[in-house]
Amino acid sequence: MSSSFPLNAWYAAAWDVDIKHALFPRTICGKHVVMYRQSNGQVSALEDACWHRLVPLSKGRLDGDTVVCGYHGLKFNAQGRCTYMPSQDTINPSACVRSYPVVERHRFIWLWMGDPALADPALVPDMHWNDDPAWAGDGKTIHVKCDYRLVVDNLMDLTHETFVHGSSIGNDHVAEAPFDVTHGDKTVTVTRWMKGIDAPPFWAAQLQKPGAVDRWQIIHFQAPGTVNIDVGVAPAGTGAPEGDRSQGVNGFVLNTMTPETATTCHYFWAFVRNYRTTEQKLTTDIREGVAGIFHEDEIILEAQQRAMNENPDRTFYNLNIDAGAMWARRVIDRMVARETGPQTMQAAE
């Protein structure tokens, strides 16, 4: 299995609130980056290695909006150009570190790790529910010791809820329900409806109405690592499958995974809802509950990665339930192939 990831893509690097006027290091797609918020509020993202001796700039300090290397005091501005060298007046014109394109959107800081000429802000994944006033919610970041694509696999096939999350969001109906898969050049959608079923514990608590429900899970994948899941329940027979969700409760599970290395990733997630939006305690309770659910996934995924590390020649076998994940993998492979040449592109087709 390839451990490649596309570089010509926007990746979430941090929650916006985590980037302050201080040096914040993070490894993304195998590249060491240091971020900080400038005095004008804009975020700068630089290669975390001094031009002089490669010491991480994150070991230094900020002087205004200038990064000062902690080893020999070279200074770099927010664009990565050296503005000071000790004991000399002339600054070598090649003295600069790479600056990465940055977009702040949907409560995340997004970095473009590839060719900066291709960094179109319009390509930032759509996660607008995360800062839409009609929706309320919150989330967290998980450092998962697995290939980011394993998290994508996990989210594209929610059959596992029956077996991993039976005490909260899963029950037998999830594993047995039929589903549809559609796909585009950089997107995959998996749609699953479960009609006239018993609500699992989490959704029963949210709906607060007795009786059978119609439940939906509509998974939207945006390459290379964003998965937004439209979820909810409504009393059975009240029109939800036909488009009227007014009698139910609706949420979105927003997920975006950023490769750190070939076998580790940063997993940013949030759960947002369009009901009881002013209840901060509910926001906190759901966030902590979902964090517990995702910890169950983390245990499984890290165990899976360890098994893969120990058995590098073993391959995956696919079931019908893997259709969404398989298409997501194909989309990612094609993105990588476009960056690495025609031979790789042919292999991805």
Residue ranges of model-derived segments:
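C-terminal catalytic domain of Rieske-type non-heme iron oxygenases
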Residues: 42, 121-349
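Rieske [2Fe-2S] iron-sulfur-binding domain
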Residues: 2-136, 188, 252, 349
